[in-house]
Amino acid sequence: MVEVITRDDLRAEIDKGSVTVVDALPAAPFASRHLPTAVNVTKEDSDDRVAEMLPDRAAPIVVYSTDSNCDRGPGLAERLDAGGYTDVRLYRDGIQDWADAGLPLDRSS
């Protein structure tokens, strides 16, 4: 089972640079806005793409999607956990919670 992380804990880890943040949404929503430092990987991506984007299976990873009603984040987090990634957590409240708190978002150029 994947552990859930809070917004405040995730923000602290992003600030320290101690976590790989993974946006589980499709490419278009990711391009329009995403959490700082996030990479885009979806549950539909091939195993090769996942391995390319997340090569270190022991690295701390936090996965998020839209909000607690979206199944993309939990689905990807469970896939990573089952695939041998050893430190996967889920930011269940997602990008909507982050944005509602007024925290910074990035966009792809």
Placement of each model-derived feature along the sequence:
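Rhodanese-like catalytic fold shared by cysteine-dependent sulfurtransferases
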Residues: 1-20, 24-63, 67-109
